[in-house]
């Protein structure tokens, strides 16, 4: 199965980039089928490369995947095609950029019914930055609602290509796939071969194998990698022995060596995927390269949330589950924390909201751990009056207001593509979320691209859902981090009968604090069950109460046994009840149901 090294001119390394749900993984299936890497009977289910249940269900690709195919072209030669399937979601854009760096070309897929969307443009820019040759492909042309010529015009405006350079296919029906294969062979250049240089290989993904440790997927940029070589990872500066190297078809195929230009895998008994970071460079220990490949960066989590087991006995199960998940996901970070209201749990850092949802769902589905999640928030920079600077990712550790000199929060630059009819709605949403409007450009007569700058905290919550609902599903968004800015933020505490519930604390902008406090108290009033005594729900900034709701006590009719009789007897019974309730209120703890934490997540509903 392996290729002789002399045939590097017949290698094509390419990836497929697209907005979510534009048919990327289905197209990958057709390519596997036409190259006979798999036949239909082996496929079983659609989307072969999306091998997590969650990936298939949500119709998204979460991890990057790599697979090698052999194709007999019309010119009579056999070509080796290395397809790298990339995630399409904004949370995983760093993974996408590293996958692109392992390729020479890209197929840009655009849905014939939807047209160019925000992440199509974001991924296109990533591909152009990586210097890739791009083949634009319009997919789903078999659907009755497809508008091939309209979408082609959008692509021409966006990329400046000629009409005959745009391919039209239907991945599901298998239309136009042969023409696409020929285009891959003729329009994507072969890799540059530098076999005589010191080894430099780019890691674009890693997965954890319970028996073999971390399996590293890499692209050999320069030099040769042989089985048994001692290798060094630049980021961790650790040394390992290459126990097994090879190529990926549907299974791992061991090889004795991988030459420059090839894509393959490396197994070298790595116990932790954090030692094999995406974007890092692998070199030889005895003949190392002087510098790493450019583009590597430490992935920083953008969204933080507390995860607590519903049943406190499951804390160890949660720890083990997070450890196992982190083996496969180097971007997940977690540290233990305790909460007065929720007990022991973990503070977790995620790339974005989708990443957070996926981790939660995998914890519940694959590991059977039931969890309560606190409100997601971002990391703030707090400058204190004594000159110190602290990073706060949890509202409960926010310093007191008197010690704070200034607070900074992260901002993102966002582009929203929508139909022109919804500009007004989106401007209104932008203003509500403290957005700073920049510009609007027309893509064609009906579609516009709007540019905003937002505080990340306003976006991570439910912005995407709101955007979809006000634009009847037509708008799409993409954002990138642009740095920290000074902001007037305060910590809003929730108190039940004077006791602060730390897990309900949030950090909000001062202009929104009153509105949040009011909504939150009203929401909690409807959720917290009645007690035998009165419960006061208060929202406070520091010692100042800004909103209050009261849950009245459940009352037993203590006068039921008094038929007529002396009023003082009745008064005595009522006084006794009042005393009992007062005593109860002093010792009683209000149980906060799980719905109260979920209420924070959809406060506007």
From Swiss-Prot:
It is a peripheral membrane protein. Coiled coil: none annotated. Keywords: Cell inner membrane, Cell membrane, GTP-binding, Hydrolase, Membrane, Nucleotide-binding, Protein biosynthesis. One of its GO terms (molecular function) is GTP binding. GTP binds at residues 21-26, 139-142. It is an enzyme of class 3 (hydrolase). SUPFAM superfamilies: EF-G C-terminal domain-like, P-loop containing nucleoside triphosphate hydrolases. Pfam families: EFG_C (PF00679), GTP_EFTU (PF00009), GTP_EFTU_D2 (PF03144), LepA_C (PF06421). PROSITE patterns: G_TR_2. It is found in: Cell inner membrane. One of its GO terms (cellular component) is plasma membrane. One of its GO terms (biological process) is positive regulation of translation. Its EC number is 3.6.5.n1. It catalyses: GTP + H2O = GDP + phosphate + H(+). Residues 9-192 form the tr-type G domain. Required for accurate and efficient protein synthesis under certain stress conditions. May act as a fidelity factor of the translation reaction, by catalyzing a one-codon backward translocation of tRNAs on improperly translocated ribosomes. Back-translocation proceeds from a post-translocation (POST) complex to a pre-translocation (PRE) complex, thus giving elongation factor G a second chance to translocate the tRNAs correctly. Binds to ribosomes in a GTP-dependent manner. HAMAP family: LepA. This is Elongation factor 4. It comes from Chlorobium chlorochromatii (strain CaD3). The lineage of its organism: Bacteria, Pseudomonadati, Chlorobiota, Chlorobiia, Chlorobiales. The gene is lepA.
